[in-house]
């Protein structure tokens, strides 16, 4: 909300070529995406099992490079993850700066930051309460949008004005109608990931004694239960389901770190059970990506894209 207009203005001082602007945005996005992937990889074994590779791939494609079409939110997501994961796991105070940076990119991350601050106040010692809340959140199917509007009346006026579109009943009906018009794959590929995340998080919670004493993973588990739970409930608000997928970035970070260690037979069976659900989402995500990428995207590279026009999507 602040960074994007500033970058547009700064780019316009030097060139009127929109490709230079996109190159700048893509470079920022690519930096944070690559750093986040490396952060996740550093938590696991050097030679991960096949399901570890699957978790990394899904993490990488939840907000993939073609999602830069939704520039502000996608960019803010990876900046926010970069800042908070450093703070959560390593107590790196620079994380606060990047979280504020994410807020300047997209105002709605004020909600995510509020949940993070709540977790810092409560800490990991309430993990049982987080888990109960997490389970309940899977069955919270409806919220009164008028009630939510009244609860945010204390916010600054510019925040309230921006949130009005998200809390509009007509907008919600349009989103529901759009979902109903999709085929089976379009309707359920996101739900399949939601339930896979729910099952795997529950599995880790049940076996959490294995990570007792591992403070980073204990914190990550407790935070995931709280963060996923909050946005399961808020996902009933139009466009807020985007934050469910922000929460899944943290969940898949935990999955990679936890399941790349020694796991028992029951845990392996649960992974095998969840794999089709995860693959369904992953394949559909790739399918959607084909609508935004062409051969020039895959073969040309950024420098060719600067001088070549007319790339055609593969689908």
In which residue ranges do the predicted regions lie?
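Short hydrophobic/aromatic helix or loop-helix immediately within or flanking a transmembrane segment
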Residues: 1-16
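Transmembrane-helix motifs of polytopic, lipid-linked glycan transferases
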Residues: 24-43
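Transmembrane-helix signature of polytopic, membrane-embedded enzymes
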Residues: 37-59
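Membrane-interface alpha helices of multi-pass inner-membrane proteins
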Residues: 63, 94-118, 228
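Membrane-water interface signatures at transmembrane helix termini and the short loops
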Residues: 65-80, 105, 202-262
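Membrane-interface transmembrane helices that cradle and orient dolichyl/undecaprenyl
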Residues: 77-94
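Alpha-helical transmembrane segments and terminal signal-anchor/GPI-anchor hydrophobic tails
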Residues: 113-241, 287-315
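Signature aromatic-anchored transmembrane alpha helix within multi-pass, membrane-resident enzymes
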Residues: 131-134, 263-283
